[in-house]
Amino acid sequence: MILVTTTPSVDGYTITNYQGIVFGEVVSGVNMFKDLGAGLRNMFGGRSQGYEEELMRARNEAIAEMQRRAEAMGAHAVVGVDIDYEVLGADNGMLMVTASGTAVQISRRA
């Protein structure tokens, strides 16, 4: 399992090698029924559970993709992770989530 952290280091470990920058990207379409529900909540207030679930799913997939790519590079961890969100498409019907960080090899401190 590849460790993932937003910090520049992993507590209790020493970074022994920097493998390079690694990304995981997911582009997801938004369902029209979720759009309808979200539009009503925008007018009347409240949270859009459909959008929140889609956002969480896309974020988890982007992190998992980043972990797979880091593992393919021979890394043990990804440090300095940042997650970005972007709305795409003429009708803003697509969501892009990007996870990025530095793939590193680590060893436990003595």
Curated annotation (Swiss-Prot):
Recorded hits in InterPro entries, A to Z, give: UPF0145_dom_sf, UPF0145_YbjQ-like
Q: Which domain of life is it from?
A: Bacteria
Tell me its family: Belongs to the UPF0145 family.
Tell me the HAMAP family matching this sequence.
UPF0145
Q: What is the protein name for this chain?
A: UPF0145 protein Blon_0093/BLIJ_0092
Q: What organism is the protein native to?
A: Bifidobacterium longum subsp. infantis (strain ATCC 15697 / DSM 20088 / JCM 1222 / NCTC 11817 / S12)
